[in-house]
């Protein structure tokens, strides 16, 4: 009986450790994806700078 308890605790402990490692890796990949998305958004903002009010690209004379 004691052998079964120790084996069960060992299996549960190893499962918990592997699960936490997987969650950590998942969190890191999500952070990297979010970082890439924010970099892309900032690049888009740089391309499209705000236009002052009343500005027209056409020359009116």
From Swiss-Prot:
<keyword id="KW-1213">G-protein coupled receptor impairing toxin</keyword>
<feature type="compositionally biased region" description="Acidic residues">
    <location>
        <begin position="30"/>
        <end position="42"/>
    </location>
</feature>
<dbReference type="GO" id="GO:0005576">
    <property type="term" value="C:extracellular region"/>
</dbReference>
<feature type="signal peptide">
    <location>
        <begin position="1"/>
        <end position="22"/>
    </location>
</feature>
<dbReference type="InterPro" id="IPR004275">
    <property type="entry name" value="Frog_antimicrobial_propeptide"/>
</dbReference>
<keyword id="KW-0878">Amphibian defense peptide</keyword>
<keyword id="KW-0800">Toxin</keyword>
<feature type="propeptide">
    <location>
        <begin position="23"/>
        <end position="48"/>
    </location>
</feature>
<keyword id="KW-0964">Secreted</keyword>
<keyword id="KW-0732">Signal</keyword>
<keyword id="KW-0838">Vasoactive</keyword>
<keyword id="KW-0765">Sulfation</keyword>
<dbReference type="Pfam" id="PF03032">
    <property type="entry name" value="FSAP_sig_propep"/>
</dbReference>
<feature type="region of interest" description="Disordered">
    <location>
        <begin position="24"/>
        <end position="61"/>
    </location>
</feature>
<keyword id="KW-0840">Vasodilator</keyword>
<dbReference type="GO" id="GO:0006952">
    <property type="term" value="P:defense response"/>
</dbReference>
<comment type="function">
    <text>May produce in vitro relaxation of rat arterial smooth muscle and constriction of intestinal smooth muscle. May target bradykinin receptors (BDKRB).</text>
</comment>
<comment type="similarity">
    <text>Belongs to the frog skin active peptide (FSAP) family. Bradykinin-related peptide subfamily.</text>
</comment>
<protein>
    <recommendedName>
        <fullName>Probradykinin-1</fullName>
    </recommendedName>
</protein>
<dbReference type="GO" id="GO:0090729">
    <property type="term" value="F:toxin activity"/>
</dbReference>
<dbReference type="GO" id="GO:0042311">
    <property type="term" value="P:vasodilation"/>
</dbReference>
């Amino acid at each position: 009986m004691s052998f079964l308890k120790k084996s069960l605790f060992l299996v549960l402990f190893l499962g918990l450790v592997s699960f936490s490692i997987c969650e950590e890796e998942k969190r890191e990949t999500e952070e990297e994806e979010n970082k890439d998305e924010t970099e892309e958004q900032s690049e888009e903002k740089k391309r499209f700078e705000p236009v002052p009010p009343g500005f027209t690209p056409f020359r009116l004379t």
